Amino acid sequence: MKLVCSQAELSSSLQLVSRAVAARPTHPVLANVLLTADAGTGRLSLTGFDLSLGIQTSLGASVATSGAITLPARLFGEIVSRMPSDSPITLSCEDGSEQVELTSVSGSYQMRGMPADDFPELPLAQAGTPIKLDPDVLIKGLRATLFASSGDEAKQLLTGVHLGLDQNGLECAATDGHRLAVLRLQNASSSEADLDVTVPARSLRELERLLSSRGGSDAVSLFCDRGQVVFQWADQVLTSRSLDGTYPNYRQLIPESFGRQLQVDRKGLLSALERVAVLADQHNNVVKLTSDPAAGQLSISADAQDVGSGSEAIGAQVSGDAIQIAFNVRYVLEGLKAMGSEQVQLQCNAPTTPVVLAPQDDSSFTYLVMPVQIRQ
């Protein structure tokens, strides 16, 4: 294998695929990145794969001799990133050898790799017709829901985001058992096929990161087959296992009607919560929200035993009887930050039943939070 490529492009590509390299590999080759040079296409392909998440990208290169080898991702990335950006890099490896030489204007480095045949095959599962997704719509769906997925591996299915596609659009949903975020998106796909799959949050965080930094507006092709999902666009591929099982019927958790509704300024509520959260963090992360229909106010308070207490009040349009309800402040803050509207609606029935927060001017996003029971 012998090729010449741009230092900047190689360094950038290595940073992308290294995010799929195993931090604690079960086999030495999983700590490596696979390099595949093709003289026919004039491309250098890089692949990182930890047996769960795989990322593949390619860059243009002047390939004199085709070939493939794996190199230690961390060491290779650190060497390349420190090479002069204004000088091309030459990579060369003799047939049958595991020694790779990197050469630039600043000098040369030798690295020992492992055979490409030792690297596990990336499960691309690209059979059938792909589902075409609008990348901007997909990014919006992921940003609105990823934060609500569970970090508890014991809740296997809840550690992912559920993606559902039908003739009405794409629906992204995530829940950790304490809160639920759902975003319904129209005109998400040019395909007529339906989709019903749950993908690990870690994989989708990397997908959102990659799509956000992409150039161009190519549609994302989604393949789903035999426990694998593959997202492909431009010269990049992300593959992930899907999560087994039937995702909870989250729609039945959302109340059909509400006896109490409040409308408040989102940024005002967010700021007040962040200030009161300083005290809530000292104890149990619980804040109490109390509505006052007569005064047209919503008060936010926290009481940290043996530390102190604090409260603030903001203006609110209140309908229904007064109510006091308690939440984990982090859940409410994260939900409000996922919204972009000026006004937010808070809808509830009783201090112990689910509360729904939604943007005043956007019915596509629903955020449900379970309250915390407090002793009076």
Predicted regions mapped to residue ranges:
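Structural preference for solvent-exposed beta-strand-turn elements
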Residues: 1-376
